[in-house]
């Protein structure tokens, strides 16, 4: 029940594929799964729709920056931290490179000898 709390804290890996659309689609569109605060800005929703139809990486980046600023200006979200990750492996794991998004940690070069 969204009316029963004053503040909500959540941790979310926002870019499992390195693309910003996941966060905007799930958290900034009315009725979507992670939009717990019922955020609703028709201009933001329209830009998210535009983002879903845009395939040029540079234009997608520009749209993402614009969307970020709009939700910050609306005070829709307060981004307060970033998870510090620790990596531990056995000595026989070779070519493992830590990355801020776990999607990129398993590569063709990763090997267990």
Predicted features by range, described:
Residues 1-28, 63-64:
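Periplasmic binding protein-like
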Residues 4, 19, 43-50, 59-66, ...:
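Extracytoplasmic/secreted proteins, especially bacterial periplasmic and envelope-associated proteins
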Residues 8-11, 55-90:
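Bilobed periplasmic-binding protein-like "clamshell/Venus-flytrap" ligand-binding domains
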Residues 1-3, 23-53, 82-113:
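Short, solvent-exposed loop/beta-turn-alpha elements that line the ligand-binding surface or hinge
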């Amino acid at each position: 029940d969204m009316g029963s709390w004053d503040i909500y804290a959540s941790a979310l890996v926002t870019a499992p594929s390195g693309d910003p659309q996941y966060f905007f689609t799930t958290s900034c569109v009315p009725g979507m799964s992670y939009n717990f605060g019922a955020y609703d800005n028709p201009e933001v929703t329209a830009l998210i729709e535009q983002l879903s139809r845009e395939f040029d990486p540079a234009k997608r980046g520009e749209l993402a920056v614009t969307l970020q600023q709009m939700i910050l200006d609306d005070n829709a979200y307060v981004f307060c931290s970033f998870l510090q990750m620790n990596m531990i492996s056995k000595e026989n794991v070779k070519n493992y490179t830590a990355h801020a998004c776990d999607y990129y940690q398993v590569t063709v070069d990763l090997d267990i000898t």
